[in-house]
């Protein structure tokens, strides 16, 4: 196996290899000028990735020739705007994905992007431009096998429903364990949000839903993370007695400490208004937590009525009601929370890294047999 990755990955990769030596794998590290790193940031990151892909292509061609490579798999990044030209290399099969990035704000939730409209408009324009480029260059036709991380991206690019949906995230088998810490210390249900506090994570939507739940009900919503929206969200809680009574800001929590947060919580809420999938979903499910999330994006692939609650809507009011109703269903029926949590842990066994590697290996072998 030959891996080409970014120069920024050299230190963590080599540190890992010192502790866990691997055979039959070789790493190459490719960098790009800092000029491009300064220009292409945030939602413009695809520009940086495409510069990197162009610099990688000659190296990939040489490795394919020298080592008689059978398959190239561009696994990351998952955004469709950054597909390389590796499918043009002679005598190899090109696997691409899972791809995301074609998601957009659902109708009814666009008000939650107030103050950030320019980002969504520019991003939408960039997506349409790259979709046009894919069509005129026929780049997707050079993919021997392609996967998508969510329906929204597949539909945006106009591919039919036979193209497989494969989540880009997975769990370590060792992390799929039975809960050992009871959550009912205070006889209240504990919801958990974990993620960066940016507008598209939907925390204002979550707060609007909380304000529809009767104040006297016993539950708590823990918010783990930090970000540019933190000040606004804190102020909103401090200004409302209902929110301040039911919302607790935990701040930034180290990854190594998140296990404890999962153990001390009952249900994970991911109220994102735009998301590819979200690693936190797999992490929570592996800890026996059911999920509440929108019936869109990658979460709609992972979660069903046996492992969590999916809410839908046609306008802002109905989305708020949908999220509120899902939370209420958890509060009034903790045994159902436990049942769906157990099912979530069972389901995540189909989404381990080993299972994913086995699936990829079958794809590679099938392509080479053909």
Task: Kindly give the residue locations of the regions a language model identified.
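Conserved donor-binding/catalytic core segment of Leloir-type glycosyltransferases
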Residues: 99, 183-201, 207-210, 222
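Short hydrophobic beta-strand element within catalytic cores of glycosyltransferases
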Residues: 290-293
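Nucleotide-activated donor-binding/catalytic signature segment of Leloir-type glycosyltransferases, i.e.
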Residues: 234-253
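Donor nucleotide-sugar binding/catalytic pocket of nucleotide-sugar-dependent glycosyltransferases
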Residues: 26-29, 96, 125-179, 186
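A short, well-ordered alpha-helix in the C-terminal region of glycosyltransferases
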Residues: 336-350, 362, 366
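Aromatic "clamp/platform" in nucleotide-sugar-dependent glycosyltransferases that forms part
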Residues: 273
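Short alpha-helical donor nucleotide-sugar binding micro-motif in glycosyltransferases
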Residues: 252-253, 260-265
């Amino acid at each position: 196996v030959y891996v080409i990755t970014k120069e920024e990955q050299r230190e963590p990769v080599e540190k890992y290899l010192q502790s866990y030596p691997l055979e039959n794998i070789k790493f190459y590290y490719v960098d790009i000028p800092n000029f491009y790193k300064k220009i292409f940031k945030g939602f413009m990151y695809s520009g940086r990735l495409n510069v990197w892909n162009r610099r990688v292509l000659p190296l990939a061609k040489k490795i394919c020739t020298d080592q008689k490579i059978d398959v190239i798999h561009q696994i990351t990044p998952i955004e469709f705007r950054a597909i390389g030209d590796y499918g043009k290399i002679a005598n190899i099969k090109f696997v691409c994905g899972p791809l995301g990035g074609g998601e957009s704000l659902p109708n009814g939730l666009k008000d939650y992007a107030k103050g950030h409209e320019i980002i969504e408009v520019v991003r939408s324009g960039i997506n349409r431009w790259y979709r046009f480029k894919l069509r005129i260059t026929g780049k997707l036709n050079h993919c021997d096998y392609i996967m998508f991380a969510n329906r929204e991206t597949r539909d945006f690019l106009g591919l039919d429903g036979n193209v497989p949906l494969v989540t880009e995230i997975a769990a370590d088998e060792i992390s799929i364990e039975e809960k050992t810490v009871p959550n009912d210390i205070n006889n209240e249900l504990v919801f958990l949000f974990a993620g960066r506090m940016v507008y598209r994570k939907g925390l204002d939507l979550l707060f609007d839903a909380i304000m529809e739940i009767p104040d006297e009900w016993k539950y708590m919503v823990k918010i783990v993370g930090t970000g540019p929206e933190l000040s606004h969200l804190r102020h909103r809680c401090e200004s409302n007695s209902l929110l301040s009574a039911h919302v607790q800001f935990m701040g930034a929590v180290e990854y190594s400490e998140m296990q404890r947060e999962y153990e001390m919580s009952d249900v994970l809420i991911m109220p994102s208004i735009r998301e590819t999938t979200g690693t936190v979903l797999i992490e929570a499910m592996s800890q026996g937590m059911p999920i509440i999330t929108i019936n869109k994006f990658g979460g709609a692939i992972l979660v069903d009525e046996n492992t969590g609650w999916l809410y839908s809507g046609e306008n802002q009011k109905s989305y708020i009601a949908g999220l509120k109703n899902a939370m209420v269903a958890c509060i009034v029926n903790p045994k159902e929370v436990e049942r769906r949590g157990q099912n979530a842990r069972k389901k995540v066994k189909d989404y381990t890294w080993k299972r994913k590697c086995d699936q990829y290996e079958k794809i590679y072998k099938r392509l080479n047999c053909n």
